[in-house]
Amino acid sequence: MRKLIYILILAAAFTACEKSQDLNCLVTLNVEIDGQDAPISVAADHSLAGTMFRNINTLENYTIPVIAGGTTQMQVLKGIYMIAFDADAILADGSSRRVRSSQYSSPEKAVNLTGDNCTVTLKLIVLQ
């Protein structure tokens, strides 16, 4: 009887691990700035309350990584996401700009990340 219980527990553990891997997707974030060349780097300002990369199904928040060379990759749970942030962008000519990404800032505008590999292009607006 005890062996049966151990076997059931191990089977459940292995099944749970396999399912959790299927729930993850690899997301590639690309950035554009109002028709300008892609920035060398974009660093989100996480001190602002409106900065988010939030799964609206689970309400889990992810840290927006530094986007270097106009692109970055991150692994998140599959779901529907709101993405919004203000950031400091450094352009190829060395100048810096304060930018905002708000195209996916509400549940109505949220982006669907349910495939295994998803690409999201963030259109940044220059603030100053």
Question: Where are each of the predicted segments found?
Answer:
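A short, solvent-exposed beta-strand micro-motif common in secreted/extracellular proteins
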Residues: T72-R97
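Beta-strand elements of well-folded, non-transmembrane domains
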Residues: I33-D37, M52-N55, A89-L91, V126-Q128
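Tryptophan-paired
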Residues: A49-I80
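Bacterial Sec-dependent N-terminal signal peptides
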Residues: Y6, F14-Q36
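Hydrophobic beta-strand residues in large extracellular and virion-surface proteins
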Residues: V27-I33, F53, M74, Y81-I83, ...
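Bacterial N-terminal signal peptides that target proteins for export
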Residues: M1-I5
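Short coil-to-beta strand junction motifs in C2/discoidin
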Residues: S41-L48
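Structured interaction patches on ligand/partner-binding surfaces of diverse proteins
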Residues: D88-Q128
